[in-house]
Amino acid sequence: MKIAVIGAGVTGLAAAARIASQGHEVTIFEKNNNVGGRMNQLKKDGFTFDMGPTIVMMPDVYKDVFTACGKNYEDYIELRQLRYIYDVYFDHDDRITVPTDLAELQQMLESIEPGSTHGFMSFLTDVYKKYEIARRYFLERTYRKPSDFYNMTSLVQGAKLKTLNHADQLIEHYIDNEKIQKLLAFQTLYIGIDPKRGPSLYSIIPMIEMMFGVHFIKGGMYGMAQGLAQLNKDLGVNIELNAEIEQIIIDPKFKRADAIKVNGDIRKFDKILCTADFPSVAESLMPDFAPIKKYPPHKIADLDYSCSAFLMYIGIDIDVTDQVRLHNVIFSDDFRGNIEEIFEGRLSYDPSIYVYVPAVADKSLAPEGKTGIYVLMPTPELKTGSGIDWSDEALTQQIKEIIYRKLATIEVFEDIKSHIVSETIFTPNDFEQTYHAKFGSAFGLMPTLAQSNYYRPQNVSRDYKDLYFAGASTHPGAGVPIVLTSAKITVDEMIKDIERGV
C-alpha cells in the first residue's frame, strides 16, 4: 500500500520506518529543510547544538524502533549511560549532584535531610506501580471506541492511579523536605505541565531517571534523528523536504482520507498518518466541509496548552567541560512562585533554568578549547502569555541578561559574558513559526485529566477512514519516549486495518 506520513519529526520518522518494515511504500512529507522536527540541530560558528530535547530516558524505547524493523540499533545510534543525572544548584554555594547509583543516592538524600531516604524510596515505589499500571492498561493502547476505555478493567486499574491527585500532592505526601520536593516537582516541566494541575502520574519522570538511568547519544540528541533518517533510507522510505502540506483531502462520499495537497499538487495515498502538531492540523489542514468533529477550528484555541520556552545556544571561547556537569538545573529562589508565573502568563525575573553542556560527553560538539551551552527557561505559551511581545528586541535582551545572571550561579560561568563568541536565541514565536506549534507550545496539549488517555486526540480518526494521528498532542502524550510509543501504537492499528482490509 502507498502510505503518506506528514512530518519528519521523531514521531514521523519512527512511524514511517515501522510501516516500511512491513513492506509498504512510504513517503514522508516535511515542511522544513531538515528532518527531526523539534529534535532539531543548530550548527553555528563551529559549535553543534541540540535545539530541542536533550535528555535520553527509557533507552529501550529508542532501541525498539530499530529492532522492530529488523535492524541492530547499534548500527544507527551509540548510547551510553551516565553515572550522574545532573547537578542541581539552589544557590552559588548550595549544589547537589544527583547520581543513579542507589548507595550514592542514599548518601545524597541523607546529606540533605537525615531520614529522608525512606520517604523518597516509598515515593519511587508508589510511582513505579502507577507507571506499570498506566503503561499496561492506558499508555500502550489506543481508544477507537468508547468501550475501549469505559469498561470494568479500565475503571479498576484507573482507580489505582488516583488520577484526581495532582503531581505536587503525591510528592508532598511522601516528602517533607522542600529541596527534595523541588528535585521531584521541577521535572514535570520536561513535558510542559504545572505540577499543581498535572495528574499525579506525571511525577513518573524522576522515577524513570532513577530506575532506568539517563543516557547520552553520541553526536547529541540529533544523533537519534539522524539514525532514524538512515533507518528510513535503508528501508526504502522516500523523504521529501520543503514539502508544505496545504490540506488533507477527504472524499465526501466515502468519508475517507485519500490524498494530500502538498506544494500545490494533489498526491493520492491509501492511508495517511499525520504527525504534525495536532491542534494546527485540526485548525488548518482539514477541509471546511470535513472538520475533526470533536476538534473543529473554532474550539482549538480553547484547549489547554503546555508551556513554551526561551532557549539560548551560547558558544564560549574557553573549555569548561571538566568543571561542569552535562545536565544542570539552577533553581529560582522562589520555585513555586516561578511555576505560577509560567502558567499564569507572566515573565520571571528570577527563573529556574536548565543548562546542557554537550561537549562534556562528546568533544566533537564544540571547537577545541571552546564550549557550547544550551539554556532553557520555561515561559508561558502565547495564549496565556499574550501580553508578552517576543518580537521586542529590548525584551529579549532583558531576558538574556536575566539568564546570564542566573548562569553565574555556576562558578565557572560567573564571567561568561566576556567569553561569548556565539549566541542564538529561540523564542515561543519561533516554536510557532518553525514547527507550526499552536501558541508556541513546546510540548503540545497539556496532559490535564481532561486531555489525557481517552480524552486526548486519538491515534485513529473517529471521523474519517484511512486517517491516523500520532505525536505530542495525541495519545499518549509528549516526551521523546512517549511520542515513540505513539508512533508504535498508531502503526500497530494501521497494520491491523490493512490486514483486515479496512
From Swiss-Prot:
Protein source organism: Staphylococcus aureus (strain Newman)
pH dependence: Optimum pH is 6.5.
Swiss-Prot/TrEMBL catalytic activity: 15-cis-4,4'-diapophytoene + 3 FAD + 3 H(+) = all-trans-4,4'-diaponeurosporene + 3 FADH2
Keyword Flavoprotein attached: yes
Taxonomic lineage: Bacteria, Bacillati, Bacillota, Bacilli, Bacillales
Other observations noted: Reacts with dehydrosqualene and not with squalene as substrate, however it can utilize zeta-carotene and phytoene to a certain extent.
Function: Involved in the biosynthesis of the yellow-orange carotenoid staphyloxanthin, which plays a role in the virulence via its protective function against oxidative stress. Catalyzes three successive dehydrogenation reactions that lead to the introduction of three double bonds into 4,4'-diapophytoene (dehydrosqualene), with 4,4'-diapophytofluene and 4,4'-diapo-zeta-carotene as intermediates, and 4,4'-diaponeurosporene (the major deep-yellow pigment in staphylococci strains) as the end product.
Keyword entries, A-Z: Carotenoid biosynthesis, FAD, Flavoprotein, Oxidoreductase, Virulence
Top-level enzyme category: oxidoreductase
Gene3D superfamilies (alphabetical): FAD/NAD(P)-binding domain (3.50.50.60)
Pathway membership, UniProt: Carotenoid biosynthesis; staphyloxanthin biosynthesis; staphyloxanthin from farnesyl diphosphate: step 2/5
Keyword Oxidoreductase: yes
A Pfam family this chain is assigned to: Amino_oxidase
Family affiliation: Belongs to the carotenoid/retinoid oxidoreductase family. CrtN subfamily.
A molecular function (GO) term: 4,4'-diapophytoene desaturase (4,4'-diaponeurosporene-forming)
Regulation: Is inhibited by diphenylamine.
GO biological process, one term: carotenoid biosynthetic process
Subunit-level organization: Homooligomer. The monomeric form also seems to be active.
Residues where FAD binds: V5, I6, G7, A8, G9, V10, T11, G12, L13, A14, A15, A16, A17
Signal peptide per UniProt: none
EC numbers: 1.3.8.-
UniProt-recorded name of the protein: 4,4'-diapophytoene desaturase (4,4'-diaponeurosporene-forming)
